[in-house]
Amino acid sequence: NHGGDHTIYPDCRPAFVDAMSAAAQAGTFEDVTIEAPYTNITKADIARHGKQLGIDYSETWSCYKGGEVHCGQCGTCRERQEALREAGIADTTEYENPA
């Protein structure tokens, strides 16, 4: 999840992550926590961090539609393209319909 997901997906909100972490601790005998380190940063910031870690984004998947290649048109494909562009990272992803 990332900062932009909060209004769209209730399970990406900090309150949900905190509640799930509390439930995991209450329901186990272990010291279990759920961490969501990217909850309050942008997708572009996440992409920059990934680049620092050496992530090859052509080897990652975002598309909701599945298939052999990214569709290039669904919301996650568009967010991916925007985040990589904002982060200054060349997008080498193969898209069926490039934006």
Segments predicted by a language model, with ranges:
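Nucleotide-activated chemistry modules centered on ATP-dependent adenylation/adenylyltransferase
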Residues: 1-99
